[in-house]
Amino acid sequence: RADEVDPVSGEMTPKRDLILKELDNAEKILDHNESYKVIHIDTGVSKKYDSHITFSAGLNGWQPLGTAALAGEKVVVYVGAPGRRTGDNTNLDLYATQYHSEASHLQKKVTSLKVGFNEITVPAVSSLGVEKGGALYIEYTGNNPNEIYAVRVIGGSQYPVLDVTRAETAEERKELTDAYVAEMAEYVQKIEEMHNENSDSEDSHSAISGLDYDERNCILGATDIVLDQMMFSIPIKQVYKSIAGNGESQDEAAEKLYQSLMAMDEMIHLFYQHKGLNAAPVTGGKTYEKDKLPTTRLNIRYQRMFAGAFMYAGGLHIGIEWDSCALL
């Protein structure tokens, strides 16, 4: 149809290039449909909603894409938005991070995404002599919870993510945790194999990184666990060790993680209540917006320590080291 000639004007449609581009986009998505999942961005999470929070500078609005990429890798981020055209601006920023980074070299904004295909080359965030790269995140920068965005990442390496923020019941939350633990149990066994796979190819992980496998610095070891008020960005092997390191069955490990995350949620809500913050601050029929809980989150991250430190509080995160991650 894009090549049909109008019988009146004798010309092709003026939108021919756009139509062909959209067809090409659709074909690429279909080609990768089985291996690249769709992430629905939560537009209820934004710094724009948290202007009343005096400590908002220490909160993080990132949403994980479940993709880790090395510096220099080409990645395509496809953004869909109902009612928008290809090339339209969005309220989505893409961030690249350095896995196990120093406090001052954690992240770099890559671009503000547009509707449709966004092809990017992952930048180097750090100059450390380890694998350069890390997890990719999106931050919603708008203030309209009715906006809808769906994102698909083509390229990089996918890793397991647990996000329980949209679970409406305890049963649904438990099911998500069970599925995550099952995926994690399989994933942790093959991280080194993934690093070394197709090592003779210039496009392989080991070739691009130029380094041998290092358990503590391989970006494939990432995972994110997203709660209402907290996001853990820590090594997946340490998560697994903490719940299954004593011979626990998969069901026991899942229950252990479920209870641990519930305890963290309850503790943070207690802290926020102590500060006078509440999910629905209503008194005498009046809603007090300044007393609402923040939408953005605390972020505990696997980071490189400076001399004498076992943890630190940075601008967008709380940094802890390898051994501490297994204690969470």
Segments predicted by a language model, with ranges:
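Beta-strand-enriched, solvent-exposed domains that form extended recognition/catalytic surfaces
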Residues: 3-175
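Catalytic cores of extracellular degradative/oxidative enzymes
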Residues: 197-201, 205-328
